[in-house]
UniProtKB/Swiss-Prot annotation:
A motif ('HIGH' region) lies at residues 11-21. Keywords: Aminoacyl-tRNA synthetase, ATP-binding, Cytoplasm, Ligase, Nucleotide-binding, Protein biosynthesis. This is Glutamate--tRNA ligase. InterPro entries: aa-tRNA-synth_I_cd-bd, aa-tRNA-synth_I_codon-bd_sub2, aa-tRNA-synth_I_CS, aa_tRNA-synth_I_cd-bd_sf, Glu-tRNA-ligase_bac/mito, Glu/Gln-tRNA-synth, Glu/Gln-tRNA-synth_Ib_cat-dom, GluQ/Sye. Catalyzes the attachment of glutamate to tRNA(Glu) in a two-step reaction: glutamate is first activated by ATP to form Glu-AMP and then transferred to the acceptor end of tRNA(Glu). Belongs to the class-I aminoacyl-tRNA synthetase family. Glutamate--tRNA ligase type 1 subfamily.
Length: 485
């Protein structure tokens, strides 16, 4: 076993980075940082049918955006490369031949139709379907007969019979599997390309991976991988299987579940902050010491340990993520919040792609009003709607305020004060509200609510004089006149 801690994240380039994959990458990264080890990023691209163009680049971009940096990979190299499975085919071929020569693997000529018929018969008998072992002990003559018919074989691993495979899992403790429940499994396809379970074992061994940290869904692969390690006479790494991630309804998360946003790139596009996503994912199945919930990447790395990774399922609480992102937005520099929110106003057609200096200052001021309450960048479009239209619709709650008997007097008094202003700024508007209070004798809610509702259309909102200033004199006075008429 390698004395140095070496961990890896090995995604398949089949699409965007899923939040489950992002959590696995993060746990590996944090463990490596905590232990002074190395974090390897490897691309498992042997399943050519499922690979998606540009997915490799998107995976790397999403990890970089999160701040999860690797020590060795396809882009930075390293002494244990290549770091892409399809560039390692000669290495796998050599190891498959070794198992064939030692009688630990064999060629299987069963067709898909034969395997399906076998499977259906087993299910009909109430048995767990597994490969029967028909081609386990073929003679050379039988093999030649199949090949004469043009049947291309797969390579299967010969699973030892009557064994108990014990795994000391760093999260779950001892986990046992019966080898008799596992049929001889395929380690190489008909074209010679290895299956995932084989390639991952060869790669992890040759890259000196000390700890395999991944999600619970991989636990069922582990006995197959352990048997391969033992067949080669290699040390088995330490396995650590983190808990399943459940959706907010406490059901197992499915990539087809559209009720929840599941890909890192989507959160980026919505205007979430990478620091918040990292913080949230770290707490999804790992618990720090104490009650604190807000951590930087460095603070997480300083605390992270496998002992505090939970085996109980973790619920992906979207409200908690929105709350956490808001904590980061509240504490961010205003320029960073503008960079997060402004593109969404431009994309929605509220502001032009190219802003004048005056427009940029105005947009910054509007966004600043919502920094305290903004949950993610795209939310700014809905929050700031009142700044981008002349006429506003008053909902029932707003209409109730406007129906109060003191309202006409308050609004006409306020309109008069605004029209008399020489300068249009928050201080002057605050003065106009005070003057209206003096002239009408109204104060508190009786004064402020009608003014807020009439000028913004909302019963709650940002600091009022600043909002009125940014809406603009022409639109504000028009709204007041429309109501009074």
């Amino acid at each position: 076993m390698a004395s140095e801690v070496r961990v890896r994240f090995a995604p398949s380039p089949t699409g965007h980075l899923h939040i489950g994959g992002a959590r696995s990458a993060l746990f590996n990264y944090l463990f490596a940082k905590n232990q002074g080890g190395m974090f390897v990023l490897r691309i498992e691209d042997t399943d050519q049918a499922r690979n998606v163009g540009q997915a490799k680049e998107k995976l790397l971009d999403s990890l970089k955006w999160l701040g999860v940096e690797w020590d060795e990979s396809i882009d930075v190299g390293g002494e244990y490369g290549p770091y892409s499975s399809m560039e390692r085919l000669d290495i796998y071929k050599k190891h498959i031949e070794q198992l064939l020569n030692e009688g630990k693997a064999y060629y299987c000529y069963m067709t898909e139709e034969e395997l399906e018929a076998e499977r259906e018969a087993q299910i009909a008998r109430g048995e767990m379907p597994k490969y029967s072992g028909r081609d386990r002990d073929l003679t050379e003559e039988q093999r030649r007969a199949y090949e004469a018919k043009g049947i291309k074989p797969v390579v299967r691993f010969r699973v030892p019979e009557g064994q108990v495979i014990k795994i000391q899992d760093a999260v779950r403790g001892e986990v046992s599997f019966e080898s008799d429940g596992i049929g001889d499994f395929v380690i190489a396809r008909k074209d010679g390309v290895p299956m995932y379970n084989f390639a991952v074992v060869v790669d992890d061994h040759l890259m000196k991976i000390s700890h395999v940290i991944r999600g619970e869904e991989h636990l069922s692969n582990t006995p197959r991988q352990v048997m391969l390690y033992e067949a080669f006479g290699w040390d088995v790494p330490t396995f650590a299987h983190a808990s399943l991630i459940l959706n907010p309804n406490r059901q197992k998360m499915s990539k087809r579940d559209e009720s929840i946003i599941q890909f890192v790139e989507q959160y980026k596009e919505l205007g979430y902050m990478p620091e918040a996503i990292v913080n949230f994912l770290a707490l999804l199945g790992w618990s720090p010491v104490g009650e604190e919930e807000i951590f930087s990447l460095e603070e997480l790395a300083a605390q992270f340990s496998l002992e505090r990774v939970s085996k109980a399922p973790a619920v992906f609480d979207t409200d908690k993520l929105a709350w956490m992102n808001n904590q980061y937005i509240k504490n961010a520099d205003l320029d960073d919040v503008v960079a997060l929110a402004l593109p969404h106003l431009q994309k929605a057609g509220k502001l032009p792609e190219s802003l004048s200096e005056e427009q940029a200052e105005w947009a910054k001021a509007v966004i600043s009003l919502y920094q305290e309450q903004l949950h993610y960048g795209a939310e700014i479009v809905e929050l700031t709607e009142l700044f981008f239209k002349t006429e506003i619709q008053y909902n029932d709650e707003a209409q109730e305020v406007l129906n109060e008997e003191q309202v006409p007097g308050v609004l006409s008094g306020f309109l008069q004060e605004l029209e008399g202003l020489d300068t249009w700024d928050a201080v002057s508007i605050k003065g106009a509200i005070k003057a209206t209070q003096k002239a009408t004798g109204q104060k508190g809610k009786k004064l402020f609510m009608p003014i807020r509702v009439a000028t913004t259309g909302q019963t709650h909102g940002p600091e009022l004089p600043s909002a009125i200033k940014l809406i603009g004199k022409e639109i504000v006075t028009h709204r007041l006149r429309s109501l009074l008429n």
